[in-house]
């Protein structure tokens, strides 16, 4: 059994990196500790230019770099020095003049950055597939019993600190080896994803010939947290985040206080945050069981997020109990005080949490307080996944959104300016409500939300019931539907409730009947031409 605590000293290191961040200081520290440096190409030149003693790999192997750098380190004196088992292969290594290499610091050609360039064609991509680098990484990781592999510049400082303490323990080398295999796995996945989108039937294999979906789908996620249980107590669960960080999200958020996030906390917080991101003006979204139960937008000069919270809460105070609250502005102390004094809340998330808000919420130790950072106004494209038994559904993220100029007025009466503001507000909310989704809204406040019904008419009925229960007036409100109305009954019921304007995608075989129903009731109706099913 391997001794977990015995420290491995480093006498010889091979350094060959594409990302040269911190490598000069790292190599200088190694030399100061008496480590001999082997290096290649640009890394060797950089070290020598900075006065660091190093031996070029070609001089060590007696074999020059060739084929425009395609062959540099693929040599027995390199891989024998890395793979050689110190307790078994010493005689063979000595016989062939192979020196042991105790540490390998390698990172790979920037394939992802290369293929992301709009002018990248297939030959350019191929030349940026690293061969020698992954081979050294895998060799060192395989022989982690005797060799340390470093693929991340962020580990340089810790490695040096350990060497100053006498060497690297087996546990450290094992962890570095795992990082190395994760690194090469992600790298090969990127290559497979790229090549898998190439249309092989074309003569010119450039970026224009790429499809959207690769033949095999590779994506890497890193475990961020093991959870007490999953969606239900009898299910085990963990939270994995994308290896490559994107825009501000629940995955990138920092938890400032509170109990550990549960499986359902993460899912609901994601729903709340993604909804509130839809609004440019100060907004509050309250979510329960992944559905918005209250949303409001209030300009800064009319009360901002403090007023928005009051209005969102007023939509459905019962459902807000134990809910998730998201803001798109910094959480201030006054708003935080209003929340914790009024209701039980599981999670509060905002781009920034003020010191005053932190102090207020600290009195409620179990409340989970998350700070996620700012996000760009222009939403980044990406992928959504849905697991099915034996498969994975992959689609582009639903970042589609409409503006006033995109609306098609289909009724005799055009909506007023205020109705247009409310229609777009309600449409943004409906996008995040489980289908079939109906949202009633007025003055950029949700009045009633009907979610998840098999019948669209029943969703509308529930929205009306919610409004009545909250003491909110439906008369004079607008209505949003995430998909078209298949029959006129949805509009007839809306007219009876006092709805004045409707926003929906359109596209039903009976659109003319639906439009006629709206005209009969003097309801203004607009089509978006875009559906927002959410299952």
From Swiss-Prot:
Tell whether Nucleus is among the UniProt keywords.
Answer: no
Q: Which reaction does it catalyse?
A: (6R)-10-formyltetrahydrofolate + 5-amino-1-(5-phospho-beta-D-ribosyl)imidazole-4-carboxamide = 5-formamido-1-(5-phospho-D-ribosyl)imidazole-4-carboxamide + (6S)-5,6,7,8-tetrahydrofolate; IMP + H2O = 5-formamido-1-(5-phospho-D-ribosyl)imidazole-4-carboxamide
The UniProt GO MF terms for this protein read: IMP cyclohydrolase activity; phosphoribosylaminoimidazolecarboxamide formyltransferase activity
What the record says about family reads: Belongs to the PurH family.
What is the protein's given name? Bifunctional purine biosynthesis protein PurH
- What organism is this sequence from? Pseudomonas aeruginosa (strain ATCC 15692 / DSM 22644 / CIP 104116 / JCM 14847 / LMG 12228 / 1C / PRS 101 / PAO1)
Q: Mind telling me which GO cellular component terms the entry cites? A: cytosol
**Its annotated pathway?**
Purine metabolism; IMP biosynthesis via de novo pathway; 5-formamido-1-(5-phospho-D-ribosyl)imidazole-4-carboxamide from 5-amino-1-(5-phospho-D-ribosyl)imidazole-4-carboxamide (10-formyl THF route): step 1/1; Purine metabolism; IMP biosynthesis via de novo pathway; IMP from 5-formamido-1-(5-phospho-D-ribosyl)imidazole-4-carboxamide: step 1/1
According to the entry, every stretch annotated as the MGS-like domain falls at 6-151
EC number(s) stated in the UniProt entry for this protein: 2.1.2.3, 3.5.4.10
- Sorted UniProt keywords: Hydrolase, Multifunctional enzyme, Purine biosynthesis, Transferase
Relay the domain remarks: The IMP cyclohydrolase activity resides in the N-terminal region.
Q: Pfam family example for this protein?
A: MGS
Any one biological process term the GO annotation gives: 'de novo' IMP biosynthetic process
């Amino acid at each position: 059994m391997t001794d977990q605590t015995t420290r491995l000293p480093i006498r010889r290191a091979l350094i060959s990196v594409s990302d040269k961040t911190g490598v000069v200081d790292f190599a200088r520290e190694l030399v100061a500790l008496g480590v001999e440096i082997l290096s290649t190409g640009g890394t060797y030149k950089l070290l020598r230019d900075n006065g660091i003693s190093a031996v070029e790999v070609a001089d060590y192997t007696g074999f020059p770099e060739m084929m425009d750098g395609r062959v540099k380190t693929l040599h027995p004196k390199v891989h024998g020095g890395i793979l050689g088992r110190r307790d078994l292969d010493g005689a063979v290594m000595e016989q062939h003049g192979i020196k042991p290499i105790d540490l390998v610091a390698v990172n790979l050609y920037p394939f992802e950055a290369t293929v992301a360039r709009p002018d990248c064609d297939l030959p350019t991509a191929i030349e940026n597939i690293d061969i020698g680098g992954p081979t050294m990484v895998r060799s060192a990781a395989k022989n982690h019993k005797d060799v340390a592999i470093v693929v991340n510049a962020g580990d340089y400082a810790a490695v040096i600190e350990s060497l100053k303490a006498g060497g690297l323990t087996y546990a450290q080398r094992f962890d570095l080896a795992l990082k190395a295999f994760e690194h090469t796995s992600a790298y090969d996945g990127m290559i497979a994803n790229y090549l898998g989108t190439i249309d092989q039937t074309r003569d010119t294999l450039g970026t224009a010939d790429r499809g959207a979906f690769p033949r095999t789908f590779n994506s890497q996620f890193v475990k961020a947290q093991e959870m007490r249980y999953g969606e239900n107590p009898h299910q085990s669960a963990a939270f994995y985040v994308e290896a490559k960080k994107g825009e501000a999200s629940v995955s990138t958020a920092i938890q400032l206080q509170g109990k550990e996030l549960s499986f359902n906390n993460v899912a609901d917080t994601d729903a709340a945050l993604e909804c509130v991101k839809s609004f440019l003006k100060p907004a509050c979204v309250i979510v329960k069981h992944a559905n918005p139960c209250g949303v409001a937008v209030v300009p800064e000069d009319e009360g901002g997020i403090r007023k928005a919270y009051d209005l969102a809460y007023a939509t459905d105070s019962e459902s807000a109990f134990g809910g998730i609250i998201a803001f798109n502005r910094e959480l201030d102390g006054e708003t935080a005080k209003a929340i914790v004094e009024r209701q039980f809340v599981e999670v509060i998330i905002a781009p920034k949490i003020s010191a005053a808000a932190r102090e207020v919420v600290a009195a409620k130790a179990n409340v989970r307080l998350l700070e996620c950072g700012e996000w760009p106004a222009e939403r980044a494209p990406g992928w959504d996944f849905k697991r099915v038994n034996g498969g994975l559904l992959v689609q582009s993220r639903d970042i589609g959104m409409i503006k006033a100029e995109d609306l098609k007025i289909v009724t005799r009466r055009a909506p007023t300016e205020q109705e247009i503001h409310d229609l777009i507000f309600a449409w943004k909310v409906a996008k995040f409500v489980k289908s079939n989704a109906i949202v009633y809204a007025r003055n950029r406040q949700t009045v009633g939300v009907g979610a998840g019904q098999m019948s669209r008419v029943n969703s509308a009925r529930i929205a009306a019931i919610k409004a009545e229960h909250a003491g909110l007036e439906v008369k004079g409100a607008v209505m949003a539907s995430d998909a078209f109305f298949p029959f006129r009954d949805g509009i007839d019921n809306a007219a009876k409730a006092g709805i004045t304007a409707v926003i929906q995608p359109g596209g039903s075989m009976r659109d003319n009947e639906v439009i006629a129903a709206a005209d009969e009731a003097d309801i203004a109706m607009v089509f978006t031409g875009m559906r927002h099913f959410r299952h």
